[in-house]
């Protein structure tokens, strides 16, 4: 019984279950994106309308308690998600809003999941107020996810091209990581690749000590070391994501 519970816990292990200070050392990429969203909340006036485009489970709603937060999504990305917090169910290519409504739009790791990203970005431009800001994050180095709704990966040149084509002015574009943090992120999946596909419970139990060691090494120790030296990569061509602020 204890072994079964331990195996179940390992199969469902998530970095979010770890304390924040450890999680930040293992996964600084996620924390940088949260800081990016916090920046949007600080730069958006109290009472202004904020659109979370592709909001999913609305994990960023709490950042905008002083603004009028509106969440929209097509709710097809993940069958296990809870979409009940959405305000509007819509296709991002045809947003059901009037022109020039929102002061800010956040679109966090969404544009890889739409078939026509230019059409979506053009819609953002339409519903954004003149002088308003768009805060976008897109993946460059990320695994296949939310299948079959996973279509694109973006370089800084690719996302810049789409935004400028839609008449946005790019204020800032930054990578979230360099080569070492990219490598750290990849390594955390090694225990899953090695052990989670084993169907025989007996073999899994026999290998359990090695699995636990693999978590300590490849999910904790090595990623922390790699993230600590990520600053040595000055080019950041292996980044996990780009964060872009653009204005109308």
Where are the model-predicted features located?
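S-adenosyl-L-methionine-dependent methyltransferase catalytic module, highlighting the catalytic core
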Residues: 118-119, 123, 129, 133-247
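Aromatic-acidic/polar surface patches that form glycan- and anion
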Residues: 22, 26-33, 113, 152, ...
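Class I SAM-dependent methyltransferase Rossmann-like catalytic core
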Residues: 1-44
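Acidic/proline-rich low-complexity IDRs
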Residues: 2-6, 14-17, 50, 91, ...
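Conserved SAM-binding loop
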Residues: 38-145, 157-160, 244-246
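Generic secretory/membrane-interface signal
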Residues: 14-17, 46, 85, 179
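A generic structural signal for ordered alpha-helices
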Residues: 11-19, 75, 83, 137, ...
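Conserved short-loop catalytic and cofactor-binding motifs
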Residues: 21, 25, 108, 146-147
């Amino acid at each position: 019984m204890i072994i079964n519970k331990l195996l179940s816990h390992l199969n469902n292990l998530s970095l979010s279950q770890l304390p924040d200070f450890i999680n930040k050392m293992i996964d600084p990429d996620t924390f940088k994106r949260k800081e990016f969203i916090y920046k949007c909340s600080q730069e958006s006036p109290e009472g202004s309308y904020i659109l979370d485009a592709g909001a999913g489970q609305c994990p960023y709603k709490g950042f905008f308690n002083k603004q009028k937060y509106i969440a929209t999504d097509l709710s097809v990305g993940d069958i296990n998600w809870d979409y009940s917090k959405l305000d509007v169910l819509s296709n991002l290519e045809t947003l059901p809003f009037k022109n020039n409504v929102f002061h800010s739009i956040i679109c966090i790791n969404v544009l890889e999941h739409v078939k026509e990203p230019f059409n979506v970005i053009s819609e953002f431009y339409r519903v954004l107020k003149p002088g308003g800001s768009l805060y976008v994050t897109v993946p460059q180095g990320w695994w296949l996810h939310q299948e079959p709704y996973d279509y694109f990966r973006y370089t800084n040149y690719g996302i810049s091209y789409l935004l400028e084509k839609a008449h946005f002015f790019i204020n800032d574009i930054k990578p979230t990581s360099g080569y070492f943090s990219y490598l750290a992120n990849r390594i955390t999946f090694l225990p899953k690749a090695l052990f989670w596909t084993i169907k025989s419970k007996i073999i899994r139990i026999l290998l359990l000590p090695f699995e636990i060691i693999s978590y300590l090494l490849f999910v904790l120790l090595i990623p922390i070391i790699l993230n600590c030296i990520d600053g040595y990569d000055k080019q950041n061509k292996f980044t996990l994501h780009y964060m872009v602020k653009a204005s109308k």
